C-alpha cells in the first residue's frame, strides 16, 4: 500500500476532505522549499504536490510559469528536486507527488526515473502533457516501482470519453 492510499483511507475514516498543497521546488530557493514542506506537514496537509521546474510549462498558468522561471534561473533541475526529496523523506510522512512534464522523464530515462522515484520516496506523478490514453508506455513502471500516475481530466472530455479512460 502506497502512502497515498494510506493517507486517503485516513481522510475517509476521519470523514473529512483532503488538503492538497502545491509548491514549485526552488522558488524562491531550495531552503525555503524545504522549510515550506516541513511547515505543510506540521499544519496537517494530506498530500504535497512538488512542481518540477520546466522551461516550457505549457499546461500551467502564468503564476506557475514565473515560479518555474525563477527556480530554473537558480539552476534547479530534476536532480536537485530528487535530492531534496531524498534528504527530507525520513522526516516527512505526507505523501509527495511530482507535477512534471513528460520530457523531463524522457531525458532522465523512463525506467531510471521511476527507480529514482522509488529510491527517494516519491509517491506519485502528475504528468499534464501525457494524456491518459497514451500512458500505457509508463504503466509497467508505475506498477513495478509502486509510483502512482495521477491523471488529469481535461474540460474537453465528454461523458462519452470519460468512462472509457478512467
Where are the model-predicted features located?
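Conserved, mostly hydrophobic/aromatic
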Residues: 21, 51, 117
Amino acid at each position: 500500500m502506497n502512502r497515498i492510499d494510506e493517507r486517503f483511507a485516513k481522510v475517509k475514516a476521519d470523514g473529512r476532505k483532503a488538503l492538497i498543497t502545491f509548491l514549485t521546488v526552488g522558488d524562491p530557493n531550495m531552503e525555503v522549499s524545504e522549510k515550506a514542506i516541513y511547515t505543510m506537514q506540521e499544519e496537517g496537509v494530506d498530500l504535497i504536490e512538488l512542481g518540477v521546474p520546466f522551461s516550457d510549462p505549457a499546461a500551467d498558468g502564468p503564476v506557475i510559469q514565473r515560479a518555474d522561471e525563477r527556480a530554473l534561473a537558480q539552476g534547479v533541475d530534476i536532480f536537485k528536486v530528487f535530492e531534496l526529496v531524498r534528504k527530507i523523506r525520513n522526516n516527512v510522512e505526507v505523501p509527495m507527488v511530482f507535477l512534471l512534464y513528460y520530457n523531463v522523464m524522457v531525458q532522465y530515462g523512463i525506467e531510471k526515473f521511476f527507480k529514482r522515484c522509488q529510491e527517494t520516496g516519491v509517491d506519485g506523478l502528475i504528468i499534464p502533457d501525457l494524456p491518459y490514453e497514451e500512458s500505457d508506455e509508463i504503466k509497467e513502471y508505475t506498477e513495478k516501482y509502486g509510483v502512482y500516475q495521477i491523471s488529469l481530466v481535461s474540460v474537453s472530455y465528454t461523458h462519452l470519453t470519460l468512462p472509457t479512460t478512467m
